[in-house]
Amino acid sequence: DCLDFGFMEQMRARTSAKKQDFWLMGEVIHGDYARYIGDGQHLLHSVTNYELHKGLYSGHNDHNYFEIAHTIRREFDENGGIYKGKKLYSFVDNHDVDRLASKLNVKENMIPIYALLYFLPGIPSIYYGSEFGIEGRKEGGNDDPLRPALNLEELEKNPPAEKLPAWIKTLSDVRKKHPAARTGRYRELMLTNRQYAFARLDETDALI
């Protein structure tokens, strides 16, 4: 571990005293994510969900929604999910892994993948530029291709994935409108290798 747990606890106390909504997120690749969050009041607010990241793209490449659903069931199931009630940081790509558009066999699968990112349990995040569907792969040990300078005006006019920016905006609007999409319970409804239906629900709202 890079950070001492006592240090994280002191950092949480001091930052919260300075600014109540100061948010602490950690990058954790392996191990028990819950260790770094604890009860949610004394350590970090969230950590990266690398386990889900892998399934989101490989489950589509392999036509295997069972992989994604198994991860979510293990992590967030109503009856015994090991991270139930915790808010993990969900992502499809970041500064250390290949861009989603470069990992997919079928680029159109970015549409359902971003829907899952926004509505499965977790805090959805978008790595800069990926909202346009740009590509990027590591070259050996060089991460520079993952972290390019971007011409936003050009990308807004001609995004590589034409439908993706508007789709992500729609997903964001729905998530903002419905609290159940953010904090509701997760319930699996139907699952085959190519079909996956689930609900997010609370006392007043439900989304399927």
Report residues per predicted region:
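Acidic/polar loop patches that form or flank catalytic/metal-binding clefts of enzymes
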Residues: M25-G26, P124-G129, P179-R185
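Substrate-binding cleft of secreted/luminal carbohydrate-active enzymes
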Residues: Y114-L117, P121-E135
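Active-site-proximal helices and loops of the catalytic beta/alpha 8
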Residues: D1-Y83, K107, L116, G133-T170, ...
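Carbohydrate-binding surface patches
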Residues: D173, L189-I208
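Active-site clefts of carbohydrate-active enzymes
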Residues: I82-N105
